[in-house]
Amino acid sequence: MXXXXKSXXQXKIXXXXXIDXXXXSKMTSWWNLGSLLGICLRLQILTGLXLAMHYTSDTATAFNSVTHICRDVNYGWVLRYMHANGASMFFICLYLHVGRGLYYGSYMFSETWNIGIILLFAVMATAFMGYVLPWGQMSFWGATVITNLLSAIPYIGTNLVEWIWGGFSVDKATLTRFFAFHFLLPFIISAMVMVHLLFLHETGSNNPTGIPSNIDMIPFHPYYTIKDILGLLLIIMMLMMLVLFSPDMLGDPDNYMPANPLNTPPHIKPEWYFLFAYAILRSIPNKLGGVVALVLSILILAIIPLLHTSKQRSMIFRPLSQCLFWLLVADLLTLTWIGGQPVEHPYIMIGQLASIMYFSIIIILMPLTSLMENHLLKW
């Protein structure tokens, strides 16, 4: 086996990337998330492929084709709910992965970090387009509201929206192109993941201390392959519990009603993994301002390496920065909660405060705290 893995040219690339890759000996379970994301992506592509064989991207039949998958296709309901809840697992892993990068200073690998941000945008776009495909009420109105935000762009906005819609409203053309892009994007994401890993393997992995560990390295296989299997078992257990016990827990009941352009649902909201960004969007009364804030809520990750003022890379020995990090996590959870609430008196104010907090923690408080910690440590 050893000889075969080393000799064939293609096998050699795979062996170098996944088996013999030297990894730091101190990496905790927070470093499992990368492989879990890879598994989530594979699972989504496989279940999505099987679903696409039975789905029709036509406004007249889309809703019925999804019903047909759940009722008539062998284990179609398992495929459908694994795909829908697999997206939730994907985003849980994604947000934890980004959080790990923030906490341990992995953003100092700027190429890997920037490709990661592009990947995050690509996955979010894919998930949004996938949500439109069942053509339920929330699919239709979610697509209408979110694509309509582009009309806030000065001068070209209206033309741009009509170009994306393929008409004067979300209709057959929109659904067909969303299906085409939803099918295509995961393969583009897979290619970008390879580039992400390529840049990561140029520098080697970070570790919890944030100190270079070139002196103490171990092979990826068998140590981290075995360690990753634990995370895999946990995520599969979570996913299967969701799929088999409460498959609709994270979905919206409105999506069980066929799309009706004449009847607007009382509360239009996206899936739970977009609620924090949706809350930031809604907290600004101006349309263009809201769109800018929405994009910046993710794009702000790109300037985090520039805001790193600490002499230490990781937060593991910086208690004040740790407090701010967990405050940021609590703030994001608050935003997620607010995004799912109606636009009423207490929620509007809480959402605005949480949005201000989100940006001020990242842009102002974290860099200042890092400088203060440097001073306290006499550096």
From Swiss-Prot:
Highest taxon listed in the record's lineage: Eukaryota
Annotated TM spans: 33-53, 77-98, 113-133, 178-198, 226-246, 288-308, 320-340, 347-367
Positions of heme b b562 binding: 83, 182
Family designation: Belongs to the cytochrome b family.
This protein's name: Cytochrome b
Keyword terms: Electron transport, Heme, Iron, Membrane, Metal-binding, Mitochondrion, Mitochondrion inner membrane, Respiratory chain, Transmembrane, Transmembrane helix, Transport, Ubiquinone
Protein localization: Mitochondrion inner membrane
Additional facts recorded: Heme 1 (or BL or b562) is low-potential and absorbs at about 562 nm, and heme 2 (or BH or b566) is high-potential and absorbs at about 566 nm.
InterPro entries per UniProt: Cyt_b/b6_C (IPR005798), Cyt_b/b6_C_sf (IPR036150), Cyt_b/b6_N (IPR005797), Cytb/b6-like_sf (IPR027387), Cytochrome_b (IPR030689), Cytochrome_b_C_euk/bac (IPR048260), Cytochrome_b_N_euk/bac (IPR048259), Di-haem_cyt_TM (IPR016174)
GO biological process: mitochondrial electron transport, ubiquinol to cytochrome c
Listed PROSITE patterns: CYTB_CTER (PS51003), CYTB_NTER (PS51002)
Residues annotated to bind heme b b566: 97, 196
Subunit details: The cytochrome bc1 complex contains 11 subunits: 3 respiratory subunits (MT-CYB, CYC1 and UQCRFS1), 2 core proteins (UQCRC1 and UQCRC2) and 6 low-molecular weight proteins (UQCRH/QCR6, UQCRB/QCR7, UQCRQ/QCR8, UQCR10/QCR9, UQCR11/QCR10 and a cleavage product of UQCRFS1). This cytochrome bc1 complex then forms a dimer.
Any one of the GO CC terms: respiratory chain complex III
Membrane-topology descriptor: Multi-pass membrane protein
Residues that hold a ubiquinone according to the record: 201
GO molecular function annotations of the record: metal ion binding; ubiquinol-cytochrome-c reductase activity
Cofactor(s) recorded in Swiss-Prot or TrEMBL: heme b
